[in-house]
């Protein structure tokens, strides 16, 4: 159980080219939020696991917040050993952003696909688009699977070479009926190098998008620093 309380204040501004619906969200906002996570870990190791799974439920609730936003999420990732010391891992990651008061979810609370969950695409430039702005979605889901590639050098024990496949979608715009939902599956495949360092895991990846919406922005190379979950 991992509880957290956050207090934030923000001022939302829009450009002169923003649509009328987007401009309606301009203003100052104050949020006091309570969030928590519940995890169930059955991995055989927290460091480079080769068997088992870990699942996590996440919820963010308003204490005092404009628009009363609520975010629910669930994720699960499993591991299985293959031949030649290779490990297959697959995971699902989901989020939903809504409002307890029935109001529209403002732009800063909307959902974007995490950079590590959809390689081959620019972060924050995938999904619903209002005019020139990518505005995120109310719902988001990803599926990721990868397998480590065997190698023959013991000195590389902190490095994994992997082949991966990513699939993701972010969709629905509650504040406007004229903005397209962008409800389309995005997919990519590629190769990556995961390096475990004292400051955390580093990932270098080369990805090729396989399916996309016409407005999505792609990229071939990606560098990530952060969690492996």
List each language-model region with its residue ranges.
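C-terminal outer-membrane beta-barrel translocator/porin domains of Gram-negative envelope proteins
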Residues: 4-159, 163-173, 215, 223-228
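C-terminal beta-signal and terminal closure region of outer-membrane beta-barrel proteins
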Residues: 174-229
């Amino acid at each position: 159980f991992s509880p957290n309380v956050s207090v934030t204040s923000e001022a939302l501004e829009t450009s002169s080219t923003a649509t009328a619906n987007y401009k309606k969200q301009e203003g100052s906002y104050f949020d006091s939020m309570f969030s928590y996570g519940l995890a169930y870990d059955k991995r055989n190791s927290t460091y480079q696991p080769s068997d088992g799974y870990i699942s996590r439920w996440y919820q963010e609730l308003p204490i005092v917040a404009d628009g009363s936003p609520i975010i629910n999420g669930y994720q699960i990732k499993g591991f299985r050993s293959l031949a030649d010391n290779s490990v297959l891992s697959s995971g699902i990651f989901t989020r939903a952003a809504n409002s307890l008061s029935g109001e529209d979810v403002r732009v800063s609370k909307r959902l974007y696909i995490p950079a590590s969950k959809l390689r081959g695409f620019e972060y924050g430039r995938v999904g619903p688009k209002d005019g020139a702005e990518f505005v995120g979605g109310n719902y988001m889901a990803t599926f990721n699977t990868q397998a480590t590639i065997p190698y023959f050098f013991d000195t590389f024990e902190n490095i994994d070479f992997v082949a991966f496949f990513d699939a993701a979608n972010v969709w629905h715009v509650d504040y406007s009926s004229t903005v397209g939902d962008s409800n389309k599956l995005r997919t990519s495949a590629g190769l990556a190098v995961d390096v475990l360092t004292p400051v955390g895991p580093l990932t270098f990846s080369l990805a090729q998008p396989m399916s996309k919406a016409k407005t999505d922005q792609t990229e071939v190379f990606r560098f990530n620093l952060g969690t492996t979950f």
